[in-house]
């Protein structure tokens, strides 16, 4: 089976690509480095020839509503239109737990993406996951000064490799609409996770938790990004991920569910 991975060069994408290949299937990376521009659709027609399913893990770093909605809307529409023409039978999108409850700019873009996929011309599935373990390090990297900041938010982080394995499993199983939410095994305050990453990197600067303004900040601090009900849970804890070199980026890309322990239900 040939599976295309949109955003296949990012953190999630590398794990998804590895999981596809480990399962014995062919991975086609949809990225600019592979000659595909998802913002204008260039190269999509050729790249999707013979593809049975597309897994979309594209991302943007903007927190602004208009930019997020524009990015995810443009990419999703271009993918779905090209998939329909190419006869692709399944579109799988990675989303975030809390997208339906937290009115944060970035999340509103993901919400728009979900709506397009679930109402689109190609049978679709949406998998919402909690933040990846890697997210804490990404937050730390945004601050180069003596102090780092983290949003005051509760999270139940999951390993990117386990999320990737779940996405591939979903792609192989067939369209499911909105799938059960995937979360990690433990609940933390995000600032605590950022502090752990800082210590693992040998940094001793303080990490301050800052509550974001408005209803979005209240929702984040109140557990709006925690899973809303029972569903699959990853097994790799944050501390195990750290011990494996996660804070320094030395954890290898996924080679399939066995690389980190398959996400259990």
Question: What is the role of each PLM region?
Answer:
Residues 25-86, 96-101:
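NAD(P)H-binding glycine-rich loop region in Rossmannoid oxidoreductase-like domains
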Residues 1-23:
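N-terminal Rossmann NAD(P)H-binding glycine-rich loop of SDR-like oxidoreductase domains
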Residues 125, 138-158, 162:
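A conserved pocket-lining segment of Rossmann-fold NAD(P)-dependent short-chain dehydrogenase/reductase
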Residues 134-145, 170-180, 203-205:
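Glycine/proline-rich active-site loop of Rossmann-fold NAD(P)-dependent oxidoreductases
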Residues 12, 54, 160-167, 182, ...:
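Non-catalytic, hydrophobic alpha-helical segments
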Residues 87-90, 95, 100, 112-138, ...:
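Conserved beta-loop-beta element that borders a ligand/cofactor-binding pocket
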Residues 187, 194-256, 261-265:
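Mobile cap/lid helix-loop segments that border enzyme active or cofactor-binding sites
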Residues 149-154, 180-187:
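Glycine-rich Rossmann NAD(P)(H)-binding loop
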